[in-house]
């Protein structure tokens, strides 16, 4: 048994804890003089005035101290433990020594830090809890022995706190120089609860007395020693034992008799406490002095002798200094900080305590050799049986009957159960054989111990017999000298008769009794050994029989391959399922993306239609357009010429078709819902077309979501938007229903929304059945129009607004002719839209399509006449009215339904020079009443739709309504206001003197 381990230098760790100021100190008028600056620095200020302050500068005489870690009154017990002691536990388990001690004057919280309370346990309890937790975590690989001793040094006398009846104990030094306490009680335990109970028992035995400075003053130094021995569970001929010791010391505080007001016994206790602390301070001073190699006097106090290894030997040491922040304890705090600062310079030489223990080498060597031979024999047998099995398999490969018999043999459930039972028997035989070998080993160890004890007792008896014969010889010599003159016969008789009987000592009698018991035990051990050897031979024979039986009943390599292939098939099935799930997720994501692209394409088509219609109105009326809007329109034209978005759409359609043709599971697209319309008959008529076009039509665009708009409404349009009117009911003007089903249910409105829609048309061909159904739906529309024609014949023409421009009549005529030549309904998708239908939009057909007066007045900056109203003649207006009236009478017999884009949730927006991006996207606003006070910023914003006007209603002075330009009374107001609705035929006069009909 010897110590081993490499040593290394370790710096002594010093921590400082400043306790909170007490109520008694505040009542005495004390002030705070100790402050924590950061995690390591503490400043102590001198409360007294400087007697050498000649210049009366009153400079602060403060001094800063730097430690490894500093705590103020806000620190908790857990924080102190984590920063100081927790790191020592791993080293103690590994075989290193460690020491933690609290230092400082009386009443500064040393006992509170070390012991704590039930609610806030101190370092003792937390360290022991973590120590046993760490032992439990590694107990599977290591064996541990934990022992504990608890003592106190009271008046320079050592007392055992676990067993106070032992009295005062003495310090001794063993052969290695380690200080030991003779007769101390060491309690071995591996249970945390038990060691906590012992700790509480020792604390109750500790000496505590009240003083004027501290009501619970500790009158002794308490030392708790925990020893941990660690050894590996794997047995070997050489075993390594690691022994670590942990010292936790609660020192008594230094005190002044003037402060504590001690008398008698308390004063003697204080003197002894101060003496031991003075010796500790001298040791700290000597150890911290780097320049001198002087002698360190540890013998001045028993405390310093116990702390010899902790201060300058083999230990990792942590010193927790405690001070009071009150000005009344300035001197004690300064001395404590001084000694703590010096202790930082102390270095200890730490090494691991390793004990190498040699056991019975010859015995363990023979056992290991037997086990290795057994392993080699089993390996050879397995190899031989494997070779015979392969050779037999090659010989019988062509024998079909043998193969069938073998398959039937291994396919039955009974054979499988027999194989499992055979394997279990073999495993149990090996386990029993190992147990018997282990018991034989234990018997051998016990027999050797009995033999050693027998030899020791025999030596004791032999020594006594030798002593007895020596005494008898000496007595005979003495008798021979005394009776030299007597007769020889008398001498012989005297010596034989008078020789005293020598009493046998008790240890010899005990040895004789022990020898008898040991002889009996040896006989029992011999019998048990013979029985175990016989059992071992039987188990070996049983194992050999099982080893010979198992190869004949075990399956071939093919069965093992089948089992592995089945496992592989299962793994591949799992992987295949995962791949299918990933494919489904990817398919769903692609289809959602395709739906989003289709929705954006519909939105783009609607925006193209709106942009082109508004541009046609601007060109027809020569309206002034801001430069910003012109630039944006040029960008738009370039994008149309490039056709990048159409190409992207075509690629998306090709990708979607390729995805549909794949073998992955299909995702059914959501059916498009038909937007409710006020015209119930129109909805019923178009429902058949919508059912056939459901797979190709897109879902309706939400007019409320701003996220999909190309142009988002700005803040300036919200007021007009809030005053807008929802989707109007059908209004009849001259027996005309001016509302139809929404355009999103029509395939033609989706494809023909842009000039380049022929490419999209070619991508979605219509079958003969679909064309026939569309034609049937169109005939239904014409039947409905014929029914309404009879009602229109009996209704007189309404007084509509008077025309104001030449373009109104021209556009009316062109629209009427274009509508006559073009069949309505979804058949319009067969050819590109007519430029006349797309761009020839005037105020009269717009008003007739919605049944309302124009909702917007066109204005520009300034109060002069508008560009498209210049040169207007009243005579031309009268002639135009007469010609229109004649046409209306001539073509009254012809009547058809006016269809228009469904206007759900209309919006009102204003356009300024820098507000082109705020235009509403796909629903143009239509208001019921004119807004006379609107001042526009250079662009006409009108509702756009494919308008069909009946020629029978286009004659007369009230058929068309001009774009009214109301006056701007304020001259500078840009805010849209709603005025009272004026009756038909009234006129307003602007500042330019021109008459405008409302």
UniProtKB/Swiss-Prot annotation:
Residues 482-494, 989-998 have a biased composition (Basic and acidic residues). The keyword Nucleotide-binding applies. One of its GO terms (cellular component) is microtubule. ATP binds at residues 104-111. Signal peptide: none annotated. Residues 662-676, 684-697, 746-761, 836-852 have a biased composition (Polar residues). Gene3D superfamilies: Kinesin motor domain. One of its GO terms (molecular function) is plus-end-directed microtubule motor activity. Keywords: ATP-binding, Cell projection, Cilium, Coiled coil, Cytoplasm, Cytoskeleton, Microtubule, Motor protein, Nucleotide-binding. PROSITE patterns: KINESIN_MOTOR_1, KINESIN_MOTOR_2. InterPro entries: Kinesin-like_fam, Kinesin_motor_CS, Kinesin_motor_dom, Kinesin_motor_dom_sf, P-loop_NTPase. Residues 482-503, 662-706, 746-765, 794-911, 948-998 are annotated as: Disordered. Residues 11-346 form the Kinesin motor domain. It is found in: Cytoplasm, Cytoskeleton; Cell projection, Cilium. Its main location: cytoplasm. CDD domains: KISc_KIP3_like. Residues 360-391, 424-452, 507-552 form a coiled coil. Disulfide bonds: none annotated. Belongs to the TRAFAC class myosin-kinesin ATPase superfamily. Kinesin family. Plus end-directed microtubule-dependent motor protein that regulates the length of motile cilia by mediating depolymerization of microtubules at ciliary tips. This is Kinesin-like protein KIF19. The lineage of its organism: Eukaryota, Metazoa, Chordata, Craniata, Vertebrata. The gene is KIF19.
């Amino acid at each position: 048994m010897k110590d081993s381990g490499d040593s290394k230098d370790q710096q002594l760790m010093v921590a400082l804890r400043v306790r909170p100021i007490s109520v008694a100190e505040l009542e005495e008028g004390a002030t705070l003089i100790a402050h924590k600056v950061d995690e390591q620095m503490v400043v102590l200020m001198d409360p007294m005035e400087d007697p050498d302050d000649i210049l009366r500068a009153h400079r602060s005489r403060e001094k800063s101290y730097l430690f490894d870690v500093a705590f103020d009154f806000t620190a908790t017990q857990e924080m102190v433990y984590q920063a100081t002691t927790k790191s020592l536990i791993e080293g103690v388990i590994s075989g290193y020594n460690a020491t933690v001690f609290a230092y400082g004057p009386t009443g500064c919280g040393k006992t509170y830090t070390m012991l704590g309370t039930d609610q806030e346990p101190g370092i003792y309890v937390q360290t022991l809890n973590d120590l046993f937790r760490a032992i439990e975590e590694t107990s599977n690989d290591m064996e541990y022995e934990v022992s504990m001793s608890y003592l106190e040094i009271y008046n320079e006398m050592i007392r055992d706190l676990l067993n106070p009846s032992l009295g005062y104990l003495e310090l001794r030094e063993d052969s290695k120089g380690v200080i030991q306490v003779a007769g101390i009680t060491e309690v071995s335990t591996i249970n945390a609860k038990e060691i906590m109970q012992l700790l509480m028992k020792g604390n109750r035995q500790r000496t505590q007395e009240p003083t004027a400075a501290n009501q619970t003053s500790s009158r002794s130094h308490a030392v708790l020693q925990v020893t941990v021995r660690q050894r590996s569970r794997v047995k070997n001929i050489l075993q390594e034992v690691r022994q670590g010791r942990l010292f936790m010391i609660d020192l008594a505080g230094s005190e002044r008799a003037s402060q504590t007001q001690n008398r008698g016994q308390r004063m003697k206790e204080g003197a002894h406490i101060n003496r031991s602390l003075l010796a500790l301070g001298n040791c700290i001073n000597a150890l911290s002095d780097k320049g001198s190699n002087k002698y360190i006097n540890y013998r001045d106090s028993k405390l310093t002798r116990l702390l010899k290894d902790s201060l300058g030997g083999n230990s990792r040491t942590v010193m927790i200094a405690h001070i009071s922040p009150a000005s009344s304890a300035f001197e004690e705090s300064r001395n404590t900080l001084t000694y703590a600062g010096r202790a930082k310079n102390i270095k200890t030489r730490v090494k691991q305590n390793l004990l190498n223990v040699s056991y019975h080498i010859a015995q363990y060597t023979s056992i290991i050799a037997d086990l290795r031979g057994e392993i080699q024999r089993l390996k050879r047998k397995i190899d031989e049986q494997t070779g015979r099995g392969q050779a037999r398999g090659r010989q019988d490969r062509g024998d079909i009957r043998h193969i069938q018999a073998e398959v039937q043999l291994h396919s039955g459930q009974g054979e499988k159960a027999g194989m499992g039972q055979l394997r279990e028997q073999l495993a149990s035989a090996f386990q029993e054989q190992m147990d018997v070998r282990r018991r034989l080993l234990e018997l051998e160890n016990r027999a050797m111990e009995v033999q050693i004890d027998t030899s020791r007792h025999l030596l004791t008896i032999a020594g006594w017999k030798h002593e007895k014969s020596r005494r008898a010889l000496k007595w005979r010599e003495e008798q021979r000298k005394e009776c030299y003159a007597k007769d020889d016969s008398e001498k012989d008789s005297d010596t034989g008769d008078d020789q005293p009987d020598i009493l046998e000592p008790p240890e010899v009698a005990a040895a004789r009794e022990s020898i008898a018991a040991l002889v009996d035990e040896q006989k029992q051990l011999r019998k048990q050994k013979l029985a175990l050897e016989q059992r071992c031979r039987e188990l070996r024979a049983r194992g050999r029989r099982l080893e010979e039986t198992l190869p004949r009943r075990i399956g071939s390599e093919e069965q093992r391959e089948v089992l592995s292939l089945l496992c592989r098939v299962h793994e591949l099935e799992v992987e295949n399922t995962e791949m299918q799930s990933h494919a489904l997720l990817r398919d769903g994501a692609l289809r959602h993306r395709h739906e989003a692209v289709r929705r954006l394409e519909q939105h783009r088509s609607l925006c193209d239609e709106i942009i082109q219609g508004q541009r046609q109105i601007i060109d027809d009326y020569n309206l002034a357009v801001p430069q910003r809007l012109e630039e944006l329109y040029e960008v738009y034209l370039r994008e149309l010429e490039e056709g990048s978005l159409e190409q992207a759409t075509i690629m998306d359609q090709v990708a979607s078709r390729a995805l549909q043709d794949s073998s992955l599971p299909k995702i059914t697209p959501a059916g498009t819902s038909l937007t409710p319309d006020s015209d119930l008959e129109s909805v019923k008529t178009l429902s058949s077309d919508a059912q056939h076009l459901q797979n190709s039509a897109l879902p309706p665009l939400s007019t409320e979501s701003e996220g999909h708009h190309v142009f988002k409404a700005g803040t300036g349009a919200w007021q007009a938007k809030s005053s807008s009117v929802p989707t109007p009911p059908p209004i009849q003007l001259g027996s005309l229903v001016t509302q139809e089903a929404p355009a999103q249910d029509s395939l033609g409105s989706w494809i023909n929304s842009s000039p380049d829609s022929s490419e999209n048309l070619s991508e979605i061909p219509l079958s003969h059945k679909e064309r026939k159904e569309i034609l049937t739906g169109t005939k239904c529309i014409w039947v409905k129009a014929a029914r309404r024609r009879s009602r229109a014949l009996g209704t007189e023409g309404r007084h509509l607004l008077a025309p104001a421009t030449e373009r109104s009549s021209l556009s009316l005529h062109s629209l009427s002719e274009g509508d006559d030549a073009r069949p309505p309904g979804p058949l319009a998708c067969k050819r590109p839209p007519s430029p006349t239908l797309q761009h020839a939009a005037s105020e009269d057909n717009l008003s007739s399509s919605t049944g309302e007066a124009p909702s917007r007045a066109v204005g520009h900056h300034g109060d002069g006449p508008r560009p498209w109203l210049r040169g207007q003649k009243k005579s031309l207006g009268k002639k135009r009215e007469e010609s229109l009236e004649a046409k209306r009478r001539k073509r009254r017999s012809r009547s058809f339904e006016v269809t228009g884009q469904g206007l759900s949730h209309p919006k009102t927006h204003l356009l300024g020079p820098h507000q082109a991006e705020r235009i509403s996207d796909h629903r143009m606003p239509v208001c019921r009443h004119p807004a006379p006070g609107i001042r526009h910023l250079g662009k006409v914003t009108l509702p756009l739709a494919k308008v069909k006007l009946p020629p029978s209603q286009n004659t007369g002075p009230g058929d068309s309504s001009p774009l009214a330009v109301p006056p701007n009374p304020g001259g500078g107001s840009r805010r849209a206001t709603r005025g009272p609705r004026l009756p038909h035929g009234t006129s307003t006069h602007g500042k330019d003197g021109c008459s405008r009909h409302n």
